[in-house]
């Protein structure tokens, strides 16, 4: 029995910060994917200019508010399963799900920020 799990991803996320000199574009890839339960899944996020480690990852399920997974690029929010991990600094960031579970079907967002989210 094929237990493929689709995961929707946000392909492009533009955010504006009023105290920055120019807008920083955040681009995620892939824009969508299909994976099986147990697979290792990697989502990347690229900033148009360096943002140090001021990056958060969110998970949003239909009809629910976004849930913070990771902040400061690699710090796991309390209560988030250890199969989620984040890495990167500067312009290139990665969210990894080490072993995909059915409950991980969601939309995933990266977001830059100026201080703790």
UniProtKB/Swiss-Prot annotation:
Keyword Cell membrane included in the entry's annotation: yes
Domain of life: Eukaryota
InterPro entries recorded: Ig-like_dom, Ig-like_dom_sf, Ig-like_fold, Ig_sub, Ig_V-set, IgV_Light_Chain
Keywords linked to the UniProt accession: Adaptive immunity, Cell membrane, Disulfide bond, Immunity, Immunoglobulin, Immunoglobulin domain, Membrane, Secreted, Signal
Signal peptide: 1-22
GO cellular component, one term: extracellular region
Region described as Framework-3: 79-110
Location of region: Complementarity-determining-2: 72-78
SMART domains hit by this protein: IG (SM00409), IGv (SM00406)
Region: Framework-1, residue numbers: 23-45
Region feature (Framework-2): 57-71
Function: V region of the variable domain of immunoglobulin light chains that participates in the antigen recognition. Immunoglobulins, also known as antibodies, are membrane-bound or secreted glycoproteins produced by B lymphocytes. In the recognition phase of humoral immunity, the membrane-bound immunoglobulins serve as receptors which, upon binding of a specific antigen, trigger the clonal expansion and differentiation of B lymphocytes into immunoglobulins-secreting plasma cells.
Protein name: Immunoglobulin kappa variable 1-27
Gene that encodes the chain: IGKV1-27
């Amino acid at each position: 029995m094929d237990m493929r799990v689709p995961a929707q991803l946000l392909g492009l996320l533009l955010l504006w910060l009023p105290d920055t000199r120019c807008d920083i574009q955040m681009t995620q890839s892939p824009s969508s994917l299909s994976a099986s339960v147990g697979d290792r899944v990697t989502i990347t996020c690229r900033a148009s200019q360096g943002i140090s480690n001021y990056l958060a990852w969110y998970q949003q399920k239909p009809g629910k508010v976004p849930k913070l997974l990771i902040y400061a690029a690699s710090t796991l929010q309390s209560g988030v399963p250890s199969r989620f991990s984040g890495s990167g600094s500067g312009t290139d960031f990665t969210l990894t799900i080490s072993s995909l579970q059915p409950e991980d079907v969601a939309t995933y967002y990266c977001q830059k920020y100026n201080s703790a989210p």
